Amino acid sequence: MTSVLIAGGTGMLGRSIASHLLDQRGVDVRLLVRDSSPRDPGKEGALQHLVSRGASIVAGDVSDPASLDQATQGVDVVISALQGRSEIIVDGQVALAEAAVRNGVRRFFPSDFAIDLFAAPEGAPQFDLRKHADALIDALPLQVVHVLNGAFMDMMLDPETAGIVNLQNNTARLWGTGDEPFNLTTADDTAHFTARLATDPEDISGVRTVSGAETTFNAIIAETERLADTTLAVQILGDADDLRRITAEAADPWSVIIQWYFLSMITVPPFTRTENHRYPELQLTTLNRYLTDAHQAHRVLQTQGQS
């Protein structure tokens, strides 16, 4: 029996990791939950669903070391899917990792789950915090595993988030030339990969990369146009120099976090190697598959709207 504690288990990625762990035999899944955390109905429902499948809730707060000592007792692996600023990503994760060491945990996953953040430009707040936390955690006597997946395919192509392509109005918006390569992986595939790494019997310390696609903005636009049999109106928002100027002039780097992300995407090289085939049962969602499904869903919505 492998015991896995997940911090951030009520978020999109964390609950998907928990779900994939529950699909495996012989895994004890524990979810670190603050007693005082506000109860979002959606998250509460997801939490109760995981509990109904066999997960257990463990009270704890990354700002309370004593609670972390209790939460990490009898645990083999800790996975952090936490989001936030310095008090969470640096202070909280380091406190969680230190509690893990004190209680004999052997493997720890910091909340990386991104492009190659170690090569990201200095100043990007979301990546600077993680690099700082990772350096402190790497120094501890743990098997530390950094999962890098590129950008989340589903979020980058969702018009309600990054909004690269919007089939509602046949538009596309991008930064750069459109030919800069980057990696994309769905959040669910990233979670599945992480869940398998968590129970891998080998010492898997270090950086582990997975990628559903290496692509460009122009390739995404061209494939969308082919599938939808349409022509998108493409808006170039600016180039890398424009992004550098915007981020440099901002009084608060968090106010331009999207611009920092796109600057990183178009300037950080794609992965030179991946471990896509480490687990044969993990069939990654390709860009074509994702865009095909998205187009079919769009057609269904159009049909419903016309009926």
Predicted features and spans:
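Catalytic domains of carbohydrate-active enzymes that cleave complex glycans
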Residues: 235-237
